[in-house]
Amino acid sequence: MLDSTRIFMKAFHLLLFDGSLIFPECILIFGLILLLMIDSTSDQKDIPWFYFISSTSLVMSITALLFRWREEPMISFSGNFQTNHFNEIFQFLILLCSTLSIPLSVEYIECTEMAITEFLLFILTATLGGMFLCGANDFITIFVAPECFSLCSYLLSGYTKKDVRSNEATMKYLLMGGASSSILVHAFSWLYGSSGGEIELQEIVNGLINTQMYNSPGISIALIFITVGIGFKLSPAPSHQWTPDVYEGSPTPVVAFLSVTSKVAASASATRIFDIPFYFSSNEWHLLLEILAILSMILGNLIAITQTSMKRMLAYSSIGQIGYVIIGIIVGDSNGGYASMITYMLFYISMNLGTFACIVLFGLRTGTDNIRDYAGLYTKDPFLALSLALCLLSLGGLPPLAGFFGKLHLFWCGWQAGLSFLVSIGLLTSVLSIYYYLKIIKLLMTGRNQEITPHVRNYKRSPLRSKNSIELSMIVCVIASTIPGISMNPIIAIAQDTLF
């Protein structure tokens, strides 16, 4: 009893003095509690009110994060959590992903008659897990935070319980996720033992120096296992097997959410884990990541060409895209690699969510996901066809769209760092990706009458000025995919200020 009281008092003391450092996260927790209270006490489900609470919580959390921006870096909760500009920019990106993803799900959930409260609870909880992962400073938090995110992801991917594909996707996702978590824990145990019992990232480096184990075989084993464990979260080749099935089987708004938030959170965690504990093994992890980047860029873009489903095509496209992001991780902060990675990640969020917004809208109006069924869409809905074309062109990296400038800066930083072969592969695979994106755009714009499928022939044209939340989110993403690329210097300057 005395021990329990002591533990409780210590936890209360930490929350009292360090709680202000996790104020954005506390806002999300309050939003979660409020959703649960309203859902459990109200007989009538007021759908707009639930969305208002969720969106307001996310916007308030973003505001609190921006107000905290200029504060000095701090380590809190007995070393478990670190607050600095680098972590905060990734937390901002995760909150931005969630804020844009919620409008995509409004009409979808109403049409499919899925439970609303639980869906929003899982979105907010996954966001909370991603934010804690960005600031995690010890092995316990690094393990618990992604598990919080992953468990919600499993539940969201299987949210349409009557859909066989959704159930299959959930099982694959769950089994692969459980295996990767166990591999990650095994890697942590090697680092824990080699450093003399340290669990904080910076203390592990000091421990390895004290024990003279920084060049031992145990560190190499830990590096391999951590690369495999984090590889599942980032889904580069060859850890990509789960990605196409989960993308195809999960509800489309869920795929939109997972396709960006998981990449952002895993990139933040991978950057800090590789850069701090494995400081003395930089050549080894650079080589491992280069192999993953090359495999991802080649396999992802090659297999994407053969796909007939839009969601599966975007799954393989995302595998190729993470290969570009890995270039920024390898370059590091010496040649602006982190700044270029963050900038490209920001553009990728808008490009990807904009594309998925178009897919959600088309799927709700036609009930199909097949690429051939998009033939002639421009004749029925020019606005949707043009929006989808702009997002796809930006993903491919055509000037003067944002994706072009993001890739250009990323590749230039890689070239300056001496990664000429890796950048050459990136350039070639980018050209390859433009090919299959242009195939879809040609289908959208020039589909002849005889090629137009019944899905598009019976398509209901949307009004030019719409109050549809999906279309509003789509407009925001399309604008963000085109305009920022022309004036990206301020974005790069802000990103460079985030280096830790």
Swiss-Prot record:
Q: What's one Pfam family the UniProt record gives for this protein?
A: Ndh2_N
Q: Which gene encodes it?
A: ndhB1
Subcellular location, record wording: Plastid, Chloroplast thylakoid membrane
Q: What is the lineage of its organism?
A: Eukaryota, Viridiplantae, Streptophyta, Embryophyta, Tracheophyta
**Could you tell me the superkingdom of the organism this chain comes from?**
Eukaryota
PANTHER family reported in the protein's UniProt record = NADH DEHYDROGENASE (PTHR22773)
Q: How does it assemble?
A: NDH is composed of at least 16 different subunits, 5 of which are encoded in the nucleus.
GO BP terms in the entry: ATP synthesis coupled electron transport; photosynthesis, light reaction
EC number(s): the record gives: 7.1.1.-
Q: What is this protein called?
A: NAD(P)H-quinone oxidoreductase subunit 2 A, chloroplastic
A single Gene Ontology CC annotation of this entry is: chloroplast thylakoid membrane
